[in-house]
């Protein structure tokens, strides 16, 4: 297979500095919004804020820039100087280093700086320690304010810096060009802007990090150049050290954080660097190996490298080095997406006051809390995958045989405090005697120190992490007991609390209290096997192949090689276009709302009697049948499309962008995206390590420097091979743009000069653009060449995908949602004796058990029952989707998919389906949920929380997260959401003899079950994604068109529903009351919908709750609730003096000549248990066609 030729796109970018220091008076308007979006700890004056046009940068801000990174000698005698430029883009975060106290802290949790310092020491990471000489030359925020004429007590100073050069600022390799300062306007206010340039400008041909930036006599400084004062601001440097370098050091397992900063800065300055960037004396975490493998601690006496974990340690550092290099390449990328503009946010539409706008932002951020919680509490989250394990050679007899899966990432959060060992496996001095926690089966509690490590030991990011966790619940919705914060705080005044961060008055907001409240969801690291990575990403395209049959009959498959057709013509004949036409026609009939697939359209006004139900169902069936017939006719007759093979190759697919401006406007969400990308880069690099090691003397001291370029090239060669798509750009300077830079001789206070010549050092760039995630539609068995282990895994899955033969309850069938919602209109007399309330559960249970008195049914009732039964049986006979429709949109799409499956002769196995768990927000459902935000603590905590709840609209941050599920993903993905999902990357060679490594990003699962998200269900036939929509909130909305299994309340209730029966509602209510107790009264209609996925039953639950409260005179009583439930059960259990009963079992099956779905040739219920009646080679009913002719739809 030949490599596709790379086509380079030329893009023009303006020259500029590597960053700016913005200095402004603290704004009177917008400060609350800025505080909500920022990350700040209450014990610090610094903060991290998002880069937002109109809030932190001016309108027209150029995100892409050719950074002036150094100078070169030119001319015959090397006397002239030209500038060297490198493309980059501005970081999506800005760093507030003076005046951060004017921003409200992200959380009231006390002493987060102390916690981070303690955690850093405990896990062995280095602290920020400026050199004594540097402190003499500090440029303070007060000094800058004085120079710019700002009041230091009312000023806000922050750094806006390019992505590739943040570390250069951190290690003092830059200076402020004071003479080049100018003024811009942000939100109507005047703001000073001081350019920041690298010191390398004064050292021609010096493309390295300057180890001693304050040495004005450095020998590389050009002759007659006036060397400037390096920019050193201690709060800023510490902030960058903690919030930028710290997370990378944790992800790459490098305890020497300063070395990571210097390595990243060096990669930015030296575009030709090839060897190792991380230091040679890097240390490693000792941990006990997974079962059946040798320990990873000290040397295994006399054994070779692999036996003592030497190759595992080597793979760990080399993969980290390669990931750092890959991140450096991405930092030099140029992106199309501009930074988000706050004036264009749709969530502000109609919000006229500052308070209303702040409330809208608070509500949106609470949505994202659900995704943050999933990343923290999922055991395979990228945040936890910080160590490398070794599965051993693929062939124990031949160690040189390469294996893509020998080295892999494993959760390391709980073993981070283990002893550190050196390259040879010897324990590092200072770590002797430390206990070694095992990878599996440890008893460590997830504590505040672990949470600090996930944030890179940054108090600001930790504060924002707590902001989100305070808006998560402890999975109350699935029946878990959540800690009573009021009682805990009150009791703690008389007992010892294992926390020295808080006092009695601040305990309610302490990080320890928040983690205690969420204790039931803490990650439990019970496996160290190679598995999927839980990643956080962003959909930045409204296009995705997430329909029920994915990319079946897609544009690329139908396109003719001669290019004789227009794109529009081809698109009209795709499966995707057919689904759009079906949905558009149903929307015209007012049955659905395409933008909200779970909505019922105007059905409440349409279905007012049984005849209307017949009409709606028949219309849906006719619309789908017509489109499917036309689609298959076009595919078979018009295009000779191999439609059966096409189904086997169909995938659900979507792409996650690497564009940093597509992420949510929050530093912590950007951190989650960065950590996810680093995990993916390392996974790719680890897959190539064994191939690099094979046949080499890995113990050699120079091995890393010699072979790091080889590994880096191998990783780069994996681009555009199925998973990580890359884009090649040719970068040129904007036409007519003058290269302005500080004078090299006049000093840093002199104005800029524009007489420089210069060129771009990195002209052609190939950089990753997006990650492609896919899931095969059909359950595929193991291939013939698969390993025995793979075949065994597939065999274990077959039972989960096997379609059972049992007959499904009518209410759990295709029309169940309509029958429950409109029962009163369809069967107004379908109510238990003695009751005035029509009850569908009682009616259909009695009917299907042949217990319903015939006298209760009119002729019209019987005709409707026959119609419903026939549709349900016919649908069940061809159904291979393991989900019942919940609305007309799902009914139409499922029915359409099943019809296509019937044409393709699909049988036996359910197909894979997708479910989006959509993050939402609401005001706190109880006083307990608001405890962390109370202005009063200690004895006044409950009163403070109640006061907040009484005036909740005055608190823009007082929102909590919630979830709702949706089984039609295309509209969800069209909202370009932030997502969290499992990702498993397979690697394989191409055709025989080809050494090109292809990959597939497989849609996998988050481990941790209900810990990750309360609505996650253990079902192998379903793939889940957590989604927080952006379109319609922080970006323009686009129009539609063109783990471990854990029993929970959620599953218990759905099990009750699936069993059916007349008393389903009362049984569900009783189970909930017994599980949740008094918390049942706090469940709102959204909670019931999330639990039950049934609108009718949700309304019943709200009514039963109201009756229980009424029975208890406004107070909740479990006895009163159970009494109400038993009364409801007794009511629907009465059948009275039945007399002759209606025989539902025999009714409707006597007409064997009735025409089932799909016309005369389609299999009806009579064929449900038999072999298909039509020939396997002909999808339309008759025998094989004449070999001389083409297959046509009319061959029946």
Swiss-Prot record:
GO terms for cellular component: host cell nucleus; nuclear viral factory. Its main location: host cell. The keyword Zinc applies. It comes from Human herpesvirus 1 (strain 17). It comes from the Viruses. Pfam families: Viral_DNA_bp. Changing residue 428 to A: In strain: Nonneuroinvasive mutant HF10. Plays several crucial roles in viral infection. Participates in the opening of the viral DNA origin to initiate replication by interacting with the origin-binding protein. May disrupt loops, hairpins and other secondary structures present on ssDNA to reduce and eliminate pausing of viral DNA polymerase at specific sites during elongation. Promotes viral DNA recombination by performing strand-transfer, characterized by the ability to transfer a DNA strand from a linear duplex to a complementary single-stranded DNA circle. Can also catalyze the renaturation of complementary single strands. Homooligomers. Forms double-helical filaments necessary for the formation of replication compartments within the host nucleus. Interacts with the origin-binding protein. Interacts with the helicase primase complex; this interaction stimulates primer synthesis activity of the helicase-primase complex. Interacts with the DNA polymerase. Interacts with the alkaline exonuclease; this interaction increases its nuclease processivity. Interacts with ICP27; this interaction plays a role in the stimulation of late gene transcription. This is Major DNA-binding protein. A motif (Required for filament formation) lies at residues 843-844, 1142-1144.
